Amino acid sequence: MKTFKFLLVAVSAVLLMGCSKTPQQETKADDDKNVVIETIMTRRSVRKYQPQAVNRDTMQTIVECGINAPNAINRQAWEVRIVDNPEVIQKLTDLYLKDNPKEAENPNFKNMFRNAPTVAFIANDTTFAYSPVDCGLMAENMILSAWSMGIGSCCLGGPARFMKSNPEANKYLLEMGFSENYDLLLCIGFGYPAETPKAKPRDAAKVKFMD
């Protein structure tokens, strides 16, 4: 009887070992079904959108994901303004076309925000050195959360530079009411995608593990 019990325990142990996964196997299995990794790896910058603005409830979720990004000493040194008024976007675009008339010849050009119907304007605190980094982390959270809900996006620096340098466009920037010492750093265009861009190659050689 003792021998039988010993054999039973031994067989059970072998079966359990056979059913258990190695750390490598667990990692591979988790990666295959990890929605975060899937979102990161499938996200693409979108430049063609359907005309309707992103639902404000959806944008609220996107912004909440943004402000939950990691940031230096929890200063939350960012401010965000969301614009989905087509008239405002068109007026800014008209000003942009005055300075860049050749853009009007592009049949795919609809507005200066890469054709997006909803735009997030993100400003950084110029008195805090880490604020631009924090704004970048916030922007990435917004972009990824948007993609996970079927919302395309494109991160933009050009419109921010234009709005700060063009006196007429700067009036719209002032109307956004950013706090003192806050400077428009970047914009993100959001919208329902009307294209499915292909992935572009990435240079993995730029990453090296150090011994």
What positions do the PLM features span?
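Bacterial N-terminal signal peptides that target proteins for export
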Residues: 1-8
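Acidic, surface-exposed loops and disordered segments
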Residues: 6, 18-211
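Bacterial N-terminal signal peptides
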Residues: 8-15
